[in-house]
Amino acid sequence: MSRGPWHVAVLMGGWSAEREVSLMSGKGVADALESRGHKVTRIDMDRDVALRLAEAKPDVVFNALHGVPGEDGTVQGMLDLMGFRYTHSGLVTSVIAIDKELTKQALVPHGIPMPTGTMVDSESLFSVDPLPRPYVLKPVNEGSSVGVAIVRDDSNYGNPISRDALGPWQQFDRLLAEPFIKGRELTVAVLGDTALAVTELRVKSGFYDYDAKYTDGLTEHVCPADVPDDVAQRMKDLALQAHRLLGCKGASRSDFRWDDEHGLAGIFLLEVNTQPGMTPLSLVPEQARAVGMDYAELVERIVEEALT
């Protein structure tokens, strides 16, 4: 299909913990497409989404959902059954990438360096630490750092963790515990078959959690990151390799920790996000700008890939 004009249904919102982020992403995408002359149907995801899509009859669906069910293969399967073309990754890739443990199983055998970890259930935390402190607890299938905590010796969760501790992970049953990797937080966006740039995330206080990601002023984005050329290239190579191994489509974003005292050996891939944010503060649009691509062009590029 040509560059349009297209009729694009933008799926956003939903009921995951990342609903508000998705609404911001969806609004940005829809506004950008309309500014380029495309017809847009905005759909706040609900249980009647299939009926609403059937009525709209779009040329393509822009999936701006984050979390379950828009990022775990559920929506992708529905769109496949309905015969709609859609942006970003397909069913199988989404099922694997949303699950941090499955992602490790898919990538580590191919030489992608990732932290060792162990699966735990939240109840077991009250009797024994799963790893030596400090360690990171994260839900297996949430994004945007929802439910993530760093458990340190001096944390207020208790030792062992107390049932009265108000840890952000408590609403989740399946957790992944990983060693805490000291150092710097970096991320690489991949668009199509190109790694765009490396961004360093410098948090004013604490760590790069949900609030730090989506509250203006809490995190400084340094793009391109001030890191050695070989480190930047290694991260871009790993992000592109992970994108290809998982079968990602459209845009993805790979998050890294880098222990800068150990050079290339200190680079660890944390996760691959197949539905990266498209808010004004989001990293993929920022990296696109760094390589000369404005927001509306980025959105059109993602839609074009879905239509080819």
UniProtKB/Swiss-Prot annotation:
Location in or out of the cell: Cytoplasm
Annotated binding of Mg(2+) 2, by residue: 271, 273
Cofactor mode of binding and number, as noted: Binds 2 magnesium or manganese ions per subunit.
Pathway listed: Cell wall biogenesis; peptidoglycan biosynthesis
Cofactor(s) this protein requires: Mg(2+); Mn(2+)
PROSITE patterns from the UniProt entry: ATP_GRASP (PS50975), DALA_DALA_LIGASE_1 (PS00843), DALA_DALA_LIGASE_2 (PS00844)
SUPFAM superfamilies per record: Glutathione synthetase ATP-binding domain-like, PreATP-grasp domain
GO terms under cellular component: cytoplasm
Pfam assignment, any one: Dala_Dala_lig_C
Gene3D superfamilies in the cross-refs: 3.40.50.20, ATP-grasp fold, A domain, ATP-grasp fold, B domain
Keyword ATP-binding belongs to the record: yes
Chief location bin: cytoplasm
Domain called ATP-grasp: residue spans: 104-304
Keywords: ATP-binding, Cell shape, Cell wall biogenesis/degradation, Cytoplasm, Ligase, Magnesium, Manganese, Metal-binding, Nucleotide-binding, Peptidoglycan synthesis
UniProt binding sites for Mg(2+) 1: 255, 271
InterPro entries reported in the protein's UniProt record: ATP-grasp (IPR011761), ATP_grasp_subdomain_1 (IPR013815), D-Ala_lig_Van_CS (IPR000291), D_ala_D_ala (IPR005905), Dala_Dala_lig_C (IPR011095), Dala_Dala_lig_N (IPR011127), PreATP-grasp_dom_sf (IPR016185)
GO molecular function, a single term: ATP binding
Keyword Nucleotide-binding: yes
Enzyme Commission number(s): 6.3.2.4
Enzyme class: ligase
Gene Ontology biological process: cell wall organization; peptidoglycan biosynthetic process; regulation of cell shape
The protein's role, per its UniProt record: Cell wall formation.
Family note: Belongs to the D-alanine--D-alanine ligase family.
Name of the protein in question: D-alanine--D-alanine ligase
Originating gene: ddl
